[in-house]
């Protein structure tokens, strides 16, 4: 009888050991799994960050994949010049050369078919080149804060000669600059520093926000993107609302949400390159009338940083990790993401009682 009991005890002890081992392994596996939620208003650079993860932590974009972006590059280029030409009418800006009016008519006549077919024919690229060189068009481009224009407009239009070549294959940088509105949730997986990342990019336009909700559970960290350069712009979906104010409103609701009490919040103040360019001629008082500092990058950027960090109502227990970023600069994103990962590792160890 004694032997039987001890054999059963032994088996039970083995089972218990196995369960403990499995639980420990599951715990370690869970600690290595990182769920990152990318949040922010529309056009703040979230999708560009996702593309950078593909370049930095995966194999980037193959030639075949880059080829597939040709139609998007063409569409972004055509849409940009059309937006500028349309705005000339609203802003009452004339072409410097009156014959450009014919080119404008040609642009609207040719663009629809070109976009549908995903091509940039010679006659259309010639029309775009002549329009972009016109001083009136350039004057209108200089006033782009008064209408909706893609950030990548000048990047593509200045490089039209290369883009219009018949054998054109987009570069990684061309791909990074493409703009396609994110609808729904885009999930990306990659491994870095022994951690398995699941990154969720969520559409930033207001109509998309209700889809975020079920992504929130069990999130390790939130990366909140803000377009620094949007301080003098209004929303595409609400012409009354300043984009920076909208961003602050959204950040406030995320940062102080009861669901995220234990979630690391990482703030990416993005598009620092565009902000640095813009701040010298477009004052920060457009967005913050109370601002009395200089319209210089360092001072103005610090002011915006403090405006966001001051929204944190739990400063004693919750830290905001802020980084200034340029999402189209791979080296910058690589450096910043390295620092972000260290914060995540440190916080994970804290949660496990190992730090």
Swiss-Prot record:
Function: Guanine nucleotide-binding proteins (G proteins) are involved as modulators or transducers in various transmembrane signaling systems. The G(i) proteins are involved in hormonal regulation of adenylate cyclase: they inhibit the cyclase in response to beta-adrenergic stimuli. May play a role in cell division.
Entry comment describing in which tissues the protein is expressed: Ubiquitously expressed. Most abundant in the lung and in the spleen.
Residues binding Mg(2+), per UniProt: 47, 182
PROSITE patterns (alphabetical): G_ALPHA
Cited Gene3D superfamilies: GI Alpha 1, domain 2-like (1.10.400.10), P-loop containing nucleotide triphosphate hydrolases (3.40.50.300)
Name assigned to this protein: Guanine nucleotide-binding protein G(i) subunit alpha-2
Region (G2 motif): 174-182
Keyword Glycosyltransferase: no
The organism's taxonomic lineage, starting at the top: Eukaryota, Metazoa, Chordata, Craniata, Vertebrata
Topology with respect to the bilayer: Lipid-anchor
Alphabetically ordered keywords of this record: Cell cycle, Cell division, Cell membrane, Cytoplasm, Cytoskeleton, GTP-binding, Lipoprotein, Magnesium, Membrane, Metal-binding, Myristate, Nucleotide-binding, Palmitate, Transducer
Subcellular localization, as worded in the UniProt entry: Cytoplasm; Cytoplasm, Cytoskeleton, Microtubule organizing center, Centrosome; Cell membrane; Membrane
Family membership: Belongs to the G-alpha family. G(i/o/t/z) subfamily.
Region of interest: G4 motif: 266-273
């Amino acid at each position: 009888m004694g032997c039987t009991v001890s054999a059963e005890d032994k088996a039970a002890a083995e089972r218990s050991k196995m369960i403990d081992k499995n639980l420990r392994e599951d715990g370690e596996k869970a600690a290595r799994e990182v769920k990152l939620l990318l949040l922010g208003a529309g056009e703040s650079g979230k999708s560009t960050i996702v593309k950078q993860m593909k370049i930095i932590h995966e194999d980037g974009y193959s030639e075949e994949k880059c080829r597939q972006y040709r139609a998007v590059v063409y569409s972004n280029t055509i849409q940009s010049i059309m937006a500028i030409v349309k705005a000339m009418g609203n802003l009452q800006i004339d072409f410097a050369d009156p014959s450009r009016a014919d080119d404008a008519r040609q642009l609207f006549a040719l663009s629809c078919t070109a976009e549908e077919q995903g091509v940039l024919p010679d006659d259309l690229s010639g029309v775009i080149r002549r329009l972009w060189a016109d001083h009136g068009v350039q004057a209108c481009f200089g006033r782009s804060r008064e209408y909706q224009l893609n950030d990548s407009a000048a990047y593509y239009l200045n490089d039209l000669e290369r883009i219009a070549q018949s054998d054109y294959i987009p570069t990684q940088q061309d791909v990074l600059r493409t703009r396609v509105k994110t609808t729904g949730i885009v999930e990306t997986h990659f491994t870095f520093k022994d951690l398995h990342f699941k990154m969720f990019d969520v559409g930033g336009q207001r109509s998309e926000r209700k889809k975020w909700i079920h992504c929130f559970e069990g999130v390790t960290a939130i990366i909140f993107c803000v377009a620094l350069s949007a301080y003098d712009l209004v929303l595409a979906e609400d012409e009354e609302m300043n984009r920076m104010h909208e961003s602050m409103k959204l950040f406030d609701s995320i940062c102080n949400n009861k669901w995220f009490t234990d979630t690391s919040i990482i703030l990416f103040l993005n598009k620092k390159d565009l902000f640095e360019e813009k701040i010298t001629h477009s004052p920060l008082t457009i967005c913050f009338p109370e601002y009395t500092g200089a319209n210089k990058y360092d001072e103005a950027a610090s002011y915006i940083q403090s405006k966001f960090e001051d929204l944190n109502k739990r400063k004693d227990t919750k830290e905001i990790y802020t980084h200034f970023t340029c999402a189209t600069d791979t080296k910058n994103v690589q450096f910043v993401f390295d620092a972000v990962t260290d914060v995540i590792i440190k916080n994970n160890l804290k949660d496990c009682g190992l730090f």
